[in-house]
């Protein structure tokens, strides 16, 4: 059997190619919108892809099943509770789907979504968005969170009854918004998860509900849009990008942060390709109702950025531009300068990390606004004082500062390092103290 995991690092999504070498046939499980990697992997193994299997209707990324169906005539199979608007072959609990002579067993495992299924094939358990490595999937993207958590608890109980040596092949890795505490490991075993995964160790349903609903990751703002696209009629490939003479709609600058800071066009929002998670960040800070022009260093980088936007349902990309007039600048702040500015109380420091990160320690007097919410606080921050944005590495701080600057706020990012570097230099941080912590 050919078994290959393919990971989209930008979104933390994992897909799988399963093939029977003797028959020369393969299936793809949970394909991403960009289907070329699966075609290349199949060709490398001398296989022909004959079917697409979906564990569920994805809420965080656009599936490639429509492209496989429209471009290659492949059938798509999903549980009927997904209520797809496209032609599909329904799969039910206990069914076996053959790839050549290899049976893939279907296990209905609701929780993340009502239609969710896992696939068991020759000791591999493709868990989709159910049992993850280090945690379980979030239960709040399709139904009321408590209902989803109760279903997920029962599904995990079922999976825990499989042999301990079963390999766990998840649908997501760390960096995905489909779970709160996911490991960046890509493969595990059921035995290892029983030893290390707190979600799998919980034996009481109410305790599990409290665990699952109390630490949910931020809800992607594109959820409804992406679900509609994945449930709706097959989505074809987007047309090639056009080189534009002028900016249409909003401007997304995907060049490195320091290039953007040194000079950029008016109104540009900077989400560098090199920083990763471009689609996720764009979903939070771009206006979904306005076309996007991509400012890139090359046509190839523009196409890469567009692919990442399409993957989260942002399909209205007008085209790309290169060499735009650099009429505006951002002035980055180093940690040493930040020390002086804070001591003089001459800036407003905005911590753009998530709450769990900030609770571990933050700059005294700093304000907390996660980067994904920064636009909503624009008016409160435009008060005559310069704003300095800070995170853990500089990546989110740069995005947040560019959003504020595009809105006319005097904003400067800490691009090199963040809170850890501040603390390493002997500066004070304040940590959130939980009850009973000392």
Residue ranges and their predicted role:
Residues 33-77:
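Active-site metal-binding motif and surrounding structural segment of the metallo-beta-lactamase
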Residues 18, 30, 56, 68, ...:
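Divalent metal-coordination and catalytic microenvironments
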Residues 28-29, 48-58, 77-81, 108-111, ...:
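Active-site neighborhood of phospho(di)ester-bond hydrolases with catalytic His/Asp-centered motifs
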Residues 77-80, 85-95:
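Glycine/small-residue-rich loop that forms an oxyanion/phosphate-binding "nest" at active or ligand-binding sites
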Residues 24, 103, 113-218:
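Metallo-beta-lactamase
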Residues 3-6, 16-17, 96-121, 125, ...:
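Core dinuclear metal-dependent hydrolase active-site scaffold
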Residues 138, 142, 191-228, 232-235, ...:
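Rhodanese-like catalytic fold shared by cysteine-dependent sulfurtransferases
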Residues 1-48, 118-128, 133-134:
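Conserved beta-strand hairpin/beta-sheet module of binuclear metal-dependent hydrolase folds
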